[in-house]
Amino acid sequence: MAKKVVAVVKIQLPAGKATPAPPVGTALGPHGVNIMAFCKEFNERTAKDAGLIIPVVITIYSDRSFSFITKTPPASVLLKKAAGIESGSPQPNKQKVGKITKQQLREIAEIKMRDLNTTDIEAAMRMIAGTARSMGIEIV
């Protein structure tokens, strides 16, 4: 028989740097999950992605066990890394803060494909291009 799901928690954490401090402690503590076990397992799984923010969906069961799925980093994080900028533009249509090439856009779309609701690379590129436009990043 399958275990009963008590809660599903979604949080974004820096890869390889989860600690029992907030936000992990405050998200998992009320459900009685072993926070150190989660942190250790998350850090092992995401060590190769150091420096990126990783969204994680944690499923908590009635026996206080858990399972989790890591997603791909948000498109905005990947775009900022590719453009070499700290943050997006406060006025995206007026003030451009960075540039990326079509090739970089394609690479980001390929990384994000498994989390996007499309199987077409061109459609994924258009979605990522929209995010870039709203951040003030120009595609050349």
UniProtKB/Swiss-Prot annotation:
Gene3D superfamilies: Ribosomal protein L11, C-terminal domain, Ribosomal protein L11/L12, N-terminal domain
UniProt GO molecular function: large ribosomal subunit rRNA binding; structural constituent of ribosome
UniProtKB keywords: Methylation, Ribonucleoprotein, Ribosomal protein, RNA-binding, rRNA-binding
CDD domains, A to Z: Ribosomal_L11 (cd00349)
InterPro entries (UniProt xref): Ribosomal_uL11 (IPR000911), Ribosomal_uL11_bac-typ (IPR006519), Ribosomal_uL11_C (IPR020783), Ribosomal_uL11_C_sf (IPR036769), Ribosomal_uL11_N (IPR020784), Ribosomal_uL11_N_sf (IPR036796)
Keyword Transmembrane helix: no
Family matches, as SMART domains: RL11
Pfam family, one: Ribosomal_L11_N
Top-level taxon in the UniProt lineage: Bacteria
SUPFAM superfamilies: Ribosomal L11/L12e N-terminal domain, Ribosomal protein L11, C-terminal domain
CC per GO annotation: cytosolic large ribosomal subunit
GO biological process, one term: translation
PTM (free text): One or more lysine residues are methylated.
Similarity section: Belongs to the universal ribosomal protein uL11 family.
Function per UniProt: Forms part of the ribosomal stalk which helps the ribosome interact with GTP-bound translation factors.
UniProt subunit comment: Part of the ribosomal stalk of the 50S ribosomal subunit. Interacts with L10 and the large rRNA to form the base of the stalk. L10 forms an elongated spine to which L12 dimers bind in a sequential fashion forming a multimeric L10(L12)X complex.
Protein name, per record: Large ribosomal subunit protein uL11
Upper taxonomic lineage: Bacteria, Bacillati, Bacillota, Clostridia, Thermoanaerobacterales
Gene giving rise to this polypeptide: rplK
